[in-house]
Amino acid sequence: MAEVLEFRVPAGSAQTLLVWGLEPTVGLEHSLFSVFSKFGLLYSVRVHSNAAVAGPGCYAIIKFYSAADASRAQHACNGQRLFQNSPLKVCVCTKQKGFQQQVLALNSNKCQELANHYLGFNGWSSRIITLQNVSGFDDENEEVGKKRSVRYLCAVEVTLPNHGVRTRGVGLGEADVESGEDPLEFGTATRRVQKLAVGKALSSAFQKILLVVLESGKVAVEYNHAAEEPTDSLTEEELEGLVQVSELPLEPFDLEEEVLSDLTLDDELPVWEVPSN
């Protein structure tokens, strides 16, 4: 049976494994990652100490993107010692009936990781259509020396040449600068906000892609019409002409956090060349 994967944080119980009976050791998360990543791409590995009533030891929550990969890992690892002296217990997580978890879109780094795994490094490409400074349109009366807001708007196109699929996404990055008169602080904030806008736009573009993983391991791609936005019907010229945020028909979506602190001034803008305005 085929499995459909979205560029979203895995939230299904079938994609999540509970591992207990772990012996506390240095590098436990790394050991778990090394073992379970052999069965498929992992979203996360989290280790926690047992509750006091459960006695000493640890347990782990491991999230796969694919439920099929999680199932194979559970059957292969349950009852095995793996990297410790005592056997581990591994089961697929279950949730209480009626429990609903918010499903977040993957951030741009995770989107690229998922695309590289299933499509290959050369199986997709992206380009920036426009990256515009839209700061100040809502802050015309800002006082000199006071906190200033930096905003950048970005539109990105993702192309999957082997599947004939092309999608676009739009993202808005913004941050406040405590001292708008400090050129170094303002320049640093500007580059980080640019990267944030590019990352959000890339994630938005990937939301329109569905990966269909067949039993044979081959991957097909479908366009996710449910994720379409008003901006998808605009021409590139119209996208490049979007300047005022108040005129931007952005559809908000719940996005896994793009962490500004992870973006340093020394980094180049992610992967793509920024068009000159």
From Swiss-Prot:
**Where would you find this protein in the cell?**
Nucleus; Cytoplasm; Nucleus, Nucleolus
Please tell me whether the keyword ATP-binding is annotated for this protein: no
Under Gene3D superfamilies, the record lists: 3.30.70.330, DNA repair protein Rad52/59/22 (3.30.390.80)
Keywords per UniProt: Cytoplasm, DNA-binding, Nucleus, RNA-binding
RRM domain location is 15-95
One short Pfam family name for this protein? RRM_1
What is an example of a GO molecular function annotated in this UniProt entry? DNA binding
The record describes the protein's role as:
Confers resistance to the antitumor agent cisplatin. Binds preferentially to sites of DNA modified by cisplatin in vitro. Binds to double-stranded DNA in a cooperative manner resulting in the formation of filament-like structures. Binds to single-stranded DNA with no cooperativity. Binds to RNA.
Q: What is the protein's quaternary organization?
A: Homodimer.
Q: What is this protein called?
A: RAD52 motif-containing protein 1
Q: What is the source species?
A: Gallus gallus
